[in-house]
């Protein structure tokens, strides 16, 4: 395992924020009917992967990708709830709990 440096954690945090922004912008694009939002979504995805590429210089890929994906899913879920009124059913909540438990296990592995 590589030694953690805060700059790589910051890059990972930026990658997570950009992924969430990309997902929200994609929803706003309405299936790319609103092209400006669609293009911004693609730009955010590109920027997210660029930030993730910087993060993995100092964080193991398996850990960085799991945290990026997990936090991205959880935060996108929250954004969908707040911005679009989307709700999960009980099975969905079980999935979120399993996702969070898996992220914790990977972090401590």
Swiss-Prot record:
GO terms for biological process: glycine betaine transport. GO terms for molecular function: amino-acid betaine transmembrane transporter activity; antiporter activity; choline transmembrane transporter activity; spermidine transmembrane transporter activity. Keywords: Cell inner membrane, Cell membrane, Membrane, Transmembrane, Transmembrane helix, Transport. Belongs to the drug/metabolite transporter (DMT) superfamily. Small multidrug resistance (SMR) (TC 2.A.7.1) family. MdtI subfamily. HAMAP family: MdtI (MF_01597). Catalyzes the excretion of spermidine. This is Spermidine export protein MdtI. It comes from Salmonella paratyphi A (strain ATCC 9150 / SARB42). The lineage of its organism: Bacteria, Pseudomonadati, Pseudomonadota, Gammaproteobacteria, Enterobacterales.
């Amino acid at each position: 395992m590589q030694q953690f440096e805060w700059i790589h954690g910051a890059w990972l945090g930026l990658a997570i924020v950009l992924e969430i922004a990309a997902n929200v912008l994609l929803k706003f694009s309405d299936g790319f009917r609103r092209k400006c939002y669609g293009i911004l979504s693609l730009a955010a995805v590109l920027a997210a992967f660029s930030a993730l590429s910087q993060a993995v210089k100092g964080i193991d890929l398996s850990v960085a990708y799991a945290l990026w994906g997990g936090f991205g899913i959880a935060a996108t879920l929250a954004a969908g709830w707040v911005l679009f009124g989307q709700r999960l059913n009980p099975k969905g909540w079980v999935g979120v709990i399993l996702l969070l438990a898996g992220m914790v296990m990977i972090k401590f592995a």
